[in-house]
Amino acid sequence: MAKKVEAYIKLQIPAGKANPSPPVGPALGQRGVNIMEFCKAFNAATQQMEQGLPIPVVITVYSDRSFTFITKTPPASVLLKKAAGIQSGSGTPNTKKVAKLNVSQLEEIAKVKKPDLTAADLAAAVRSIAGTARSMGIEVEGLE
């Protein structure tokens, strides 16, 4: 018989830098999960990723206090800011543009994000990423 799911916990943790301090400790502690065991497993799973990049993770906690987790790809906004070399997006994206990216850069980001996107193909994924870029005040060159 399958284990009974007690909770799903969604967090964004920097790759390779999970530790028992907030937000990880309190979120897992109130569910009775072994915090250090999760931190070691998460850090091992994100070891090959760029250190410090925020990684969304969904932790499934079972009634016997065991857990499993699924790591997702970094948020598109973080990847766009990194590609554009900016600290934050524009406060007024319609009037003030903060950076320019071309289609090839968006394709690279779309390839990274593809597993988590519902887009049918790469072109649709690029359009989705371009929409995120425009909402951040990043100008997209070469997209019709």
UniProtKB/Swiss-Prot annotation:
Coiled coil: none annotated. Gene3D superfamilies: Ribosomal protein L11, C-terminal domain (1.10.10.250), Ribosomal protein L11/L12, N-terminal domain (3.30.1550.10). The keyword Ribosomal protein applies. One of its GO terms (biological process) is translation. GO terms for cellular component: cytosolic large ribosomal subunit. One or more lysine residues are methylated. Part of the ribosomal stalk of the 50S ribosomal subunit. Interacts with L10 and the large rRNA to form the base of the stalk. L10 forms an elongated spine to which L12 dimers bind in a sequential fashion forming a multimeric L10(L12)X complex. This is Large ribosomal subunit protein uL11. It comes from Legionella pneumophila subsp. pneumophila (strain Philadelphia 1 / ATCC 33152 / DSM 7513). The gene is rplK.
